Amino acid sequence: VDLAKILEDLDYYRYWVAEHHNFRGVVSSATALLIQHILANTKKIKVGSGGVMLPNHSPLQVAETYGTLETLYPHRVDLGVGRAPGTDAATASLIYRQKYANIHNFMEDILQLERYFGSEDEQGVVIANPGINTNVPIIILGSSTSSAYVAAELGLPYSFATHFAPAMAEEALSIYRKHFKASKYLDEPYFILGVLAHGADTDEEAERLYTIAQQGSIRLLREEKGLYPLADEKFEENLN
């Protein structure tokens, strides 16, 4: 919340909260609750999900939740959506209460969300209330070229995670621009680039924060649990 307030004072436009599960160093497992708390303690900055991992939720649940947020905080909510589970297979199985399998249809889930957020004429037997006529902005998140095709086909904004796949960013952007189809949401492509950055009062402190993040990446690759270390004298050895 403190960081969101600082960014709001600096006139930043949006602040996003991720969805991750079974990570001790990450507290954003209940994404919508954190978003609501930040919205309640700020005045104008847009706050959203970066993002909701659709395999973990039904479109109806997502539409009800974010339709409620949009009703409480009009024009301040973003709904970024992704196709990954945001966790390991074992944890995903517990979320599903069955063996995890990539069985959901990402594009169909997004189309269903658009219907739930749309007008009365677009609704079916089941409605998301509140949600109707809220038109919550949907942004496609991804770290691969496949998500670029989806965003382009649906004419939606696209946010690429370069902190996960920096080598694919240029290709993904090219695909999105080349295949983009205008929609009722966008006349032209809208691309957001997510980058990893560390800021501090001094260069030394920023460097220290950066090395902590690097250590966290190493621990993730090694499938090590626990909080990130604040300092590691063997960092260079581990990096090699």
Model segments located where?
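Conserved, mostly hydrophobic/aromatic
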Residues: 7, 11, 19, 38, ...
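A conserved active-site cap/scaffold subdomain adjacent to cofactor or substrate pockets
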Residues: 148-167, 172-173, 177
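The substrate-binding groove and active-site-proximal loops of carbohydrate-active enzymes
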Residues: 23-24, 48-56
